[in-house]
Amino acid sequence: MEISEEMIRQTIREVLAGVDQEKSGSSQVESASVEDGDLFEEIGPAERGIRNDEVVIAVGPAFGKYQKDTIVHVPHRDVIREMTAGVEEEGLAIRFIRVTGTSDVAFIAHEAAKYSGSGIGIGIQSKGTTVIHQKDLVPLSNLELFPQAPLLTHETYRAIGKNAAKYAKGESPNPVPTMNDQMARPKYQATSALLHIKETQYVKKHTKPTSLKLK
């Protein structure tokens, strides 16, 4: 997919508009920026799991709420559907939380792992970058990292869910295969940075994760 100059301009306009809203401190303006049809319902503070047959998916501050699709316009609902299917195909349960204290995907994923009864979690940013993590690893380490969000497809997200479930069962699966495109980074770099800035606007430092229910 080609990223047009107009798409970049639109993203810049949205980012600048969000900055202006934050500066104004107006809750009315902030609430108006939320699109109808949020993907999740927030149901209270997240709790640490006790089931060893679960995988926790942690989404970024804007995922499914202020942003609705990845950098290549894979709908967030599709991403969650595929990951859920992958986990369930391995016979495991799934829980969702939202991390608002950071927009760094490594730390989002590590929070997922810490809240998961199995110790395995998946973290995903709104632009699509994804990490499979284990609670005993340091945040900047991981089990699998998927940094090139423009190359992640429906099939990839499903495979990520399956592998996370396999790790939770104590298996050592082969890493999820991904496409490799040396031009993806320069092609999408500006848009990726802008989308990350947009998500970072909704970070509330020192807040704890929220439990989510898929609508």
Question: PLM ranges: what are they?
Answer:
Residues 1-37:
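Protein-protein interaction and targeting regions used for scaffolding, dimerization, and localization
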Residues 21-29, 91-99, 172-182:
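Flexible, glycine/charged-enriched surface loops at secondary-structure junctions
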Residues 43-91:
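Glycine-rich phosphate/diphosphate-binding loop of Rossmann-like nucleotide-binding domains
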Residues 12-23, 83-91, 116, 164-172:
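Structural signal for hydrophobic packing residues in well-ordered secondary-structure cores
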Residues 39-44, 106-109:
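Glycine-rich, charged/polar anion/phosphate-binding loops
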Residues 80-113:
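Active-site rim loops that border cofactor/substrate pockets in soluble metabolic enzymes
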Residues 103-140:
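Glycine-rich phosphate-binding loop
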Residues 66, 71, 140-215:
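C-terminal binding/interaction regions
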